[in-house]
Swiss-Prot record:
<keyword id="KW-1015">Disulfide bond</keyword>
<protein>
    <recommendedName>
        <fullName>Non-specific lipid transfer protein GPI-anchored 21</fullName>
    </recommendedName>
</protein>
<feature type="compositionally biased region" description="Low complexity">
    <location>
        <begin position="126"/>
        <end position="156"/>
    </location>
</feature>
<feature type="disulfide bond">
    <location>
        <begin position="44"/>
        <end position="59"/>
    </location>
</feature>
<feature type="region of interest" description="Disordered">
    <location>
        <begin position="116"/>
        <end position="182"/>
    </location>
</feature>
<keyword id="KW-0449">Lipoprotein</keyword>
<feature type="disulfide bond">
    <location>
        <begin position="60"/>
        <end position="100"/>
    </location>
</feature>
<feature type="signal peptide">
    <location>
        <begin position="1"/>
        <end position="27"/>
    </location>
</feature>
<keyword id="KW-0325">Glycoprotein</keyword>
<feature type="lipid moiety-binding region" description="GPI-anchor amidated serine">
    <location>
        <position position="179"/>
    </location>
</feature>
<dbReference type="InterPro" id="IPR043325">
    <property type="entry name" value="LTSS"/>
</dbReference>
<keyword id="KW-0732">Signal</keyword>
<dbReference type="GO" id="GO:0098552">
    <property type="term" value="C:side of membrane"/>
</dbReference>
<keyword id="KW-1003">Cell membrane</keyword>
<comment type="similarity">
    <text>Belongs to the plant LTP family.</text>
</comment>
<comment type="function">
    <text>Probable lipid transfer protein.</text>
</comment>
<feature type="disulfide bond">
    <location>
        <begin position="33"/>
        <end position="75"/>
    </location>
</feature>
C-alpha cells in the first residue's frame, strides 16, 4: 500500500472513530454499513478515488465477504452512497465488482432495490361525454341536422279541379266552343217556311 492510499485509509478510519460512540453515528445516518464493514473495505479507497488503476487483493477479498454478510452495504459502496467524507468516483465504484471478478453485484443491487411506484395517468380535469355535450348545447346539435326539403304539394290546383268538374280537360285545356253553323242553317230554314206560309195566305186572300 503506497503512502497516498495509506493516508486515505487513515482518514476513513479516523472519520468513523472520531466520535465517542460509532453506533450513535450509524443510527443517525441510518446506513446498513457497520464500522467493521467500512474498515474492511479501506483497501478500496485508492481505486474508488482514482488513485489506483486496479483494486488491491485486500479490497476484492473484503467485497467477496460482503456479498454473503452485508449485501446492502456493498450496494451502497458500488453506488457511491456510503455516507463518508471521501470523494468517491461513481463510475469507478460501479466498475469495482467487475474489476474484482464479481460482475453480478450491480444486477443484484438493482434487484434488491424497491421499485418506484408507477405514475398514474395525468388528469386534465373532468372529461365530458359526447352525450353530455349534446344535451347541454341543443342549438349546437341542431346545427348538425340535415336541412329539411320543402314538401311539394301533390294536390292538383283548384283551377284544374274546377275545369275538370265542368267537363273540361283535367290538364286545364278548355274544349272548343260549339260551331254556330247548324243553328244559323236552322233559322234560315225557319225563315223560308214562314215566308212560304205568308205567301200562301196572301194568295188566297
Amino acid at each position: 500500500m503506497n503512502s497516498n492510499s495509506f493516508l486515505i485509509s487513515a482518514a476513513l478510519i479516523f472519520s468513523l472513530l472520531s466520535s465517542n460512540s460509532p453506533t450513535s453515528i450509524l443510527a443517525q445516518i441510518n446506513t446498513p454499513c457497520s464500522p467493521s464493514m467500512l474498515s474492511s473495505v479501506t483497501g478500496c479507497t485508492s481505486f474508488l478515488t482514482g488513485g489506483g488503476s486496479f483494486p488491491t487483493s485486500d479490497c476484492c477479498g473484503a467485497l467477496k465477504s460482503l456479498t454473503g454478510t452485508g449485501m446492502d452495504c456493498l450496494c451502497l459502496i458500488v453506488t457511491a452512497g456510503v455516507p463518508i467524507s471521501i470523494p468517491i468516483n461513481r463510475t469507478l465504484a460501479i466498475s469495482l465488482p467487475r474489476a474484482c471478478g464479481i460482475p453480478g453485484v450491480p444486477v443484484q443491487c438493482k434487484a434488491s432495490a424497491a421499485p418506484l411506484p408507477t405514475p398514474g395517468p395525468a388528469s386534465f380535469g373532468p372529461t365530458t361525454s359526447p352525450t353530455d355535450s349534446q344535451t347541454s348545447d341543443p342549438e349546437g346539435s341542431a346545427s348538425f341536422r340535415p336541412p329539411t326539403s320543402p314538401t311539394t304539394s301533390q294536390t292538383p290546383n283548384d283551377k284544374d279541379l274546377s275545369g275538370s268538374g265542368n267537363g273540361g280537360d283535367p290538364m286545364g285545356f278548355a274544349p272548343p266552343p260549339p260551331s254556330s253553323s247548324p243553328s244559323s242553317s236552322h233559322s234560315l230554314k225557319l225563315s223560308y217556311l214562314l215566308f212560304a206560309f205568308a205567301f200562301t195566305i196572301i194568295k188566297f186572300i
